[in-house]
UniProtKB/Swiss-Prot annotation:
It holds the Pfam family Ribosomal_L29. Keywords: Ribonucleoprotein, Ribosomal protein. Belongs to the universal ribosomal protein uL29 family. GO terms for biological process: translation. The keyword Cell division does not apply. NCBIfam families: L29. GO terms for molecular function: structural constituent of ribosome. This is Large ribosomal subunit protein uL29.
Length: 68
């Protein structure tokens, strides 16, 4: 997921997408323990997407608190 796509998301959309990606990451971890992954970059990219989204959420929180 690209940064401009994340920046365009609302708070609710970000929370839903983070939840979805964390569930997918748990599935990937489970399958990784059983057999080697076909594409190990999926794990890495999922972790990075989650981090980007959490960073964007934090930026939104800080922006709201500074405006209030």
């Amino acid at each position: 997921m690209k940064n401009y796509e994340i920046a365009a998301m609302s708070r609710k959309e970000l929370l839903e997408k983070i939840d979805e990606l964390e569930n997918r990451l748990a599935d990937i971890n489970f399958h990784k323990a059983i057999e080697p992954p076909q594409n190990p970059m999926v794990f890495r990219n999922s972790k990075r997407d989650i981090a980007r989204m959490k960073t964007r959420l934090r930026q939104m929180e800080l922006q709201e608190s500074s405006n209030a």
